[in-house]
């Protein structure tokens, strides 16, 4: 691939954004500053008008260590990277590009500078540009990414410690002359090819010790002799896996790392001197150079002029890089053969992980053991003739990289065995339970769980023994086995809880059915104010006073029966006493919810008003013996009405609150339910409705929980009931008045005189006499049974219905004939009718009023 240097002239002739696809060259390889190009690029990227709202990051490190690759992955830039077919300088000079990663978590307007790598063979011993470019990056950037390999940590020249020392010295000389201002920067050490064998904290400690020694060794201006490196620099660290050997892991970690390039705040609780470093946003306000974006080009050019004119700086040549370079090449060569064997397994494992279907890979253990042995022997035969220290270090690095990947495969294999084993265990237990339920025979849940758990553990150990690589630090899988057994126990407990939940649900449905019937019967009995219908046949106290006592007793007995059922069945689950206590506690709470829902259903305003009216009519329309009353003018209708109404009105306050007649207080619901068991979890409580007087956080007292009808509803209910009762009373009065007849006395004499012949004819004729006798006996029996009233009402109803039907048929006849239609037309507007009014024939009562009005009263 072409190097960045090959594109150096693009910005000189093009002005569109595509001309800067690979960024803009700020300083070329000849140390010349490209001010016009930089200014134009910032304008095209819309950075110039952003004021202080921009950030600058630089990266430096040894050549061919993947700095450009790192920036491209972090910021989506297109810096040219080194070809895998050759090793030579890629980035020439200093290049800049704007962040192309559009993640919302990153700061806006991030500018990234790719600095030419140090220790390149192209420049050889001439390291002046390396020094000056590093100083320029430090002088202009908020964050300086130091790109080093893990194996370079602890080295002096390999880790560019000499260059950092020079940076510290010149930084004090050039930028700290203003004693009133402290310029701070962040040195972000990105440790490449991080294997994880050495903890990152240890690498941090080593690097910070090196930083402290470097700072102590530099000459400081007057007044700064006692200064500390932490006075001017902050430090952060991050380890990245090998891009070639762990590409997916590398991409994943770079994505995580990119999220840290956002605005942050200093944590006052962290002390860098104690090895405490931030892992939050890297852009702190004190890092910013406070140079407006539109003046950055001129500022950067001035800084470069100061640096390029300082001719006293130089860096020594690093002596051991050859051995390190060759060992790296050999390591990569042996890893190629290693990859040929291992990568297919890694691909299968990663693909299965992405699909969420972990797979146990056959033959993995043998392939792992063989590939590791071959890689170590091949490296030993080729690299052992080089520098012993480098060889030993690189061999350890090879083993670390190989073991890291093999350990990942091993753990992935165990993870697959873990997940598949858990899934199979759960399915096997569920299938066994369903089989027992279908057969209709009892099954021992605890025995099923123990048997399936033993099978699952045996299978897991078999997979682990076949995959493990002896002699490695991770060959002991006892911890994974313990975790597996622990999760099996957790799944067993969850399955047991689920089974107990299903048992509880069945018991709750049984309670709901029983309470629905029993409580429904008690409420239905309210419709009768006489003996019978659920009321006691004997006793002076009305049955309504004991209403809530009966409801509570039925409720308690039903729940006790349900608890016995639940406890007996739970014993086969091997459930602990704590789990049974939680189940019984939930059952009581759920049962109260069922009872309260049933009460609320029965106490709906319409239902309650209907029951009150039925209760009133039962007391008003029937006598104490249960015989319907036939109202006569001489009856004390007002007295009976008043007693029946007042008796029914006493039900409203009685039903408004759930109170026991024995104690004149609400039932002891809080004591009956009991306290929340200590073993209850949030999952046990999340589906439970709060109960007043039981749950403190509910904010309701027990008295409020037992209030069925509010005071406002009681008043409204009383008014509506009285209106309905008044309608019944008016109907009774009309019935009594309608039965009155006033026959004049002279009518009887006239009847006797005019009908004497007919009377004699009837008495002399046996047939007529017998018929008269039968009619007289029937009339007497009807009178004794108080049936004349119903017969008269039925006759009136039949006659009224006949009249209504006759009117209907007459109207239909008139509408179907020509003469009738003409007569109807005359009554319409424009005809000879009275002003076009239309009158509908209505059925009238005995007082000449519309019968519909009486029906409206009856409906109340």
From Swiss-Prot:
Pfam families: RHD3_GTPase, Sey1_3HB. The chain crosses the membrane at residues 743-763, 767-787. It is a multi-pass membrane protein. Residues 1-742, 788-860 are cytoplasmic. Residues 51-300 form the GB1/RHD3-type G domain. Residues 764-766 are lumenal. It is found in: Endoplasmic reticulum membrane. Residues 443-501 form a coiled coil. Residues 818-860 are annotated as: Disordered. Its EC number is 3.6.5.-. The keyword Coiled coil applies. GTP binds at residues 61-68. Cooperates with the reticulon proteins and tubule-shaping DP1 family proteins to generate and maintain the structure of the tubular endoplasmic reticulum network. Has GTPase activity, which is required for its function in ER organization. PANTHER family: PROTEIN SEY1. This is Protein sey1. It comes from Aspergillus oryzae (strain ATCC 42149 / RIB 40). The gene is sey1.
